[in-house]
């Protein structure tokens, strides 16, 4: 053994060939700050070996290196810029030393090589991979850019276009694509990986492969003519601005850095990467996006913990076909849980099966599946008009019309048709679960399971605990949702649960703005372009359905009369009375026509102004800041109330439910992250300017207490120790 650290070791393999093996104590290798320092120490030893002829880099885990340790990021981002820059310089000096070894080097890469893991293997001369490889640089999705030389080495290896496509989008690619673009030199079976890597290394040592020529382009400026460079970077910048937009500075910064470094050698180019990385790491966007990653891990970890002692349902059933039922049935079958889909109408069953078939056909068209797989999945969805097959299902989700009487009747009838241990769930979006449970003999086996439309795209499933719901029931439904590839978040029961409860105060803020003379077009524009929502409130209401929103608004008003009962006729009422139900019938706030792809495209419709004039004061202009404040304060206040009342368990779960269920702009990180970034004291000052607008604008007492001490909702993060000192670690 030449060197042994906590996460890697260095050993002789055979005659003059050393192996450097990443082998962290946990289940995966991460390139954390300690591992980077340890890599430097291993290289100290390696550089002193006079008999060294070659070096093989590999991993002892199922994945090579999953990336940097993102749990370190928030504390690293708080380190002063100069110190962070120093540490990056130190880290890059380690990778440069790996690249500059006076012998040929190869990485034997299995599984994931992401972020720092990818940057590490880019520093070796050759890369041999297994078929399960996923390699790439996802940093821009975390609000930063590659910091260990990825933006320097990858363009010089692959060419600017291929590298920018991976770096700007935060992409990873599989083995076949990686070999095609030159990111790896070959792909072999896992059992042949080390043997194959050694064979390449021996050829390089013997002079059959020119490893110095392979290394040289990574040390030199990018080989691009002036015209090629102009075209390449102009197109890339245009595309990045179009897709990422102004709210995500990392992708455009990465492209501009690659452009600026194109005519420089490696060491000067790395200085530019350093200069670009450090300011990005100090942005609110980076903190928010890293926060989302960490929250996602927290939520998924909680789901794993909840389900560790229960068996995942093997057979499921859906009550109510149609678009939603068909979507749930498809998702369950697609992920390997056969499903019985029941409806009382042949027409609805056909609609549900058509929806499932349509989604499978899309997978077929994209080349994700073949005809055999399509037939196999569709055959596991059994459409029935009666209860045949219900005696063998483990879980049933009801997705019939949003009417308490209908739902109660269907649930009570179904309870008599299933085994005593079968779990029942309702896909209601607003009706309290404890109310629906009142007709059941086994309320402990019942909970809410709120999917979001379209089911196959929306990651969130709210799992709602009723008054009498057992822990085992919650665990089984969470297990099924996880098996379906969803992110389940457990919430306690109340009208609207969490997501709809906080959405309708937002819609109420919108209605009040319209009442006071604001133009819905401007509101949509401000909330989309300035705040960053994927859809403005008018557009979102049209997509949800004005009739659906009108009904849900009444349910929410009955549930929270003090705040959500209104004493005026609003825009939703006016459109509902005029039979303008949104996208579903082509007329809402906007008019909809099908585009060439058969998707609804919104257009302006002057008729709506006349309808809104009846429920609005004369038109007046509001500033962007006023619109954002009046829209967001009711939502934020309600989110805080939900935390204070125990409807949602933590700020992390609240933020993930908003991002995954409503499309809350990820660069804000969610409601609590946005609140912490703004500062509770500043938020209180802003909200108090609008408290005359009514109870929705009154800040909850718990938030007032936080504001008095300017406390955050997320635990305070301490800056990492002066990371420049890691040079001597």
Swiss-Prot record:
Region of interest (Enoyl-CoA hydratase/isomerase), ranges: 1-189
Cross-referenced NCBIfam families: FadB, PRK11730.1
Organism: Enterobacter cloacae
EC number of this enzyme: 4.2.1.17, 5.1.2.3, 5.3.3.8, 1.1.1.35
GO molecular function annotation: 3-hydroxybutyryl-CoA epimerase activity; delta(3)-delta(2)-enoyl-CoA isomerase activity; enoyl-CoA hydratase activity; long-chain-3-hydroxyacyl-CoA dehydrogenase activity; NAD+ binding
Function: Involved in the aerobic and anaerobic degradation of long-chain fatty acids via beta-oxidation cycle. Catalyzes the formation of 3-oxoacyl-CoA from enoyl-CoA via L-3-hydroxyacyl-CoA. It can also use D-3-hydroxyacyl-CoA and cis-3-enoyl-CoA as substrate.
Gene Ontology annotations for the cellular component aspect, listed alphabetically: fatty acid beta-oxidation multienzyme complex
PROSITE patterns named among the record's database cross-references: 3HCDH, ENOYL_COA_HYDRATASE
TM helices/strands, residue ranges: none
Family in the record: In the N-terminal section; belongs to the enoyl-CoA hydratase/isomerase family.
PANTHER family referenced in this protein's UniProt entry, alphabetically: TRIFUNCTIONAL ENZYME SUBUNIT ALPHA (PTHR43612), TRIFUNCTIONAL ENZYME SUBUNIT ALPHA, MITOCHONDRIAL (PTHR43612:SF3)
Protein name from the UniProt record: Fatty acid oxidation complex subunit alpha
GO biological process: fatty acid beta-oxidation
Summary of subunit composition and partner proteins: Heterotetramer of two alpha chains (FadB) and two beta chains (FadA).
């Amino acid at each position: 053994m030449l060197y042994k650290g906590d996460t890697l070791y260095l050993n002789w393999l055979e005659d003059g060939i050393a192996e450097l093996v990443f082998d962290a104590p946990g289940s995966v290798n991460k390139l954390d700050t300690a591992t980077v320092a340890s890599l430097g120490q291993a290289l100290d030893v390696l550089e002193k070996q006079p008999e060294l002829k070659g070096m093989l880099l590999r991993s002892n885990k199922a994945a090579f290196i999953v990336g940097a340790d993102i749990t370190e990021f928030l504390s690293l981002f708080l380190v002063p810029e100069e110190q962070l820059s120093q540490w990056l310089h130190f880290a890059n000096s380690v990778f440069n030393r790996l690249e500059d070894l006076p012998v040929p080097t190869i990485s034997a890469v299995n599984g994931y090589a992401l972020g720092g893991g990818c940057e590490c293997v880019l520093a070796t001369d050759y890369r041999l991979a297994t078929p399960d490889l996923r390699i790439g640089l996802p940093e821009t999705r975390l609000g930063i850019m590659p910091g260990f030389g990825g933006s320097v080495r990858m363009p010089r290896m692959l060419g600017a276009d291929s590298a920018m496509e991976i770096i700007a989008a935060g992409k990873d690619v599989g083995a076949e694509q990686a070999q095609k673009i030159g990111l790896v030199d070959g792909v072999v079976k896992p059992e042949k990986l080390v043997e194959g890597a050694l064979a390449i290394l021996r050829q390089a040592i013997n002079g059959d492969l020119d490893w110095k020529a392979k290394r040289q382009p990574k040390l030199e400026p990018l080989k691009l003519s002036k015209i090629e460079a102009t075209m390449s970077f102009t197109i890339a910048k245009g595309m990045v601005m179009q897709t990422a937009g102004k709210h995500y500075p990392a992708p455009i910064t990465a492209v501009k850095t690659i452009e600026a470094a194109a005519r420089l050698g490696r060491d000067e180019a790395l200085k530019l990467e350093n200069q670009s990385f450090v300011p990005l790491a100090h942005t609110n966007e980076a903190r928010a996006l890293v926060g989302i990653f960490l929250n996602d891990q927290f939520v998924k970890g909680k789901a794993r913990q909840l389900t560790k002692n229960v068996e995942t349902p093997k057979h499921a059933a859906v009550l109510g076909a149609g678009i939603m039922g068909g979507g749930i049935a498809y998702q369950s079958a697609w992920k390997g849980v056969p499903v019985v889909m029941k409806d009382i109408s042949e027409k609805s069953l056909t609609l549900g099966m058509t929806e499932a078939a349509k989604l499978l056909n899309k997978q077929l068209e994209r080349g994700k599946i073949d005809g055999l797989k399509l037939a196999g999945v569709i055959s596991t969805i059994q459409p029935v008009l009666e209860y045949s097959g219900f005696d063998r299902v483990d879980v049933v989700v009801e997705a019939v019309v949003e009417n308490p009487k209908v739902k109660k009747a269907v649930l009570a009838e179904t309870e008599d048709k299933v085994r005593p241990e079968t779990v029942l769930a309702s896909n209601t979006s607003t009706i309290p679960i404890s109310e629906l449970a009142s007709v059941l003999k086994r309320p402990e086996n019942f909970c809410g399971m709120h999917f979001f439309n379209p089911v196959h795209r929306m990651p969130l499933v709210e799992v709602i605990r009723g008054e009498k719901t057992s822990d085992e029931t919650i665990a089984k439904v969470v297990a099924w949702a996880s098996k379906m590839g969803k992110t389940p978040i457990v919430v306690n029961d109340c009208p609207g649960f969490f997501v709809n409860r906080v959405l309708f105060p937002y819609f109420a803020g919108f209605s009040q703005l319209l009442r006071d003379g604001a133009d819905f077009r401007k509101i949509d524009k401000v909330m989309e372009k300035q705040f960053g929502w994927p859809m403005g409130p008018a557009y979102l209401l049209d997509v949800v359905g004005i009739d659906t929103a009108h009904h849900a608004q009444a349910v929410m008003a009955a549930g929270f009369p003090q705040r959500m009962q209104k004493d005026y006729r609003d825009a939703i009422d006016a459109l509902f009375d005029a039979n303008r139900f949104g996208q579903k019938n082509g007329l809402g706030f906007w008019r909809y026509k099908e585009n060439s792809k058969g998707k609804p495209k919104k257009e302006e419709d002057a008729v709506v102004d006349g309808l809104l004039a009846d429920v609005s004061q004369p038109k007046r202009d509001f500033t962007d800041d006023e619109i954002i404040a009046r829209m967001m304060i009711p939502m934020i206040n309600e989110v805080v109330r939900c935390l204070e009342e125990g409807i949602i368990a933590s700020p992390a779960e609240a933020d993930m439910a908003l991002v995954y269920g409503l499309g809350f702009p990820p660069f804000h990180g969610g409601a609590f992250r946005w609140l912490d970034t703004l500062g509770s004291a500043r938020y209180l000052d802003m909200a108090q300017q609008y408290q005359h607008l009514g109870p929705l604008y009154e800040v909850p007492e718990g938030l007032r207490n936080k504001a008095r001490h300017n406390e955050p909702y997320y635990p305070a993060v301490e800056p990492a120790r002066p990371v420049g000192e890691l040079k001597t670690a």
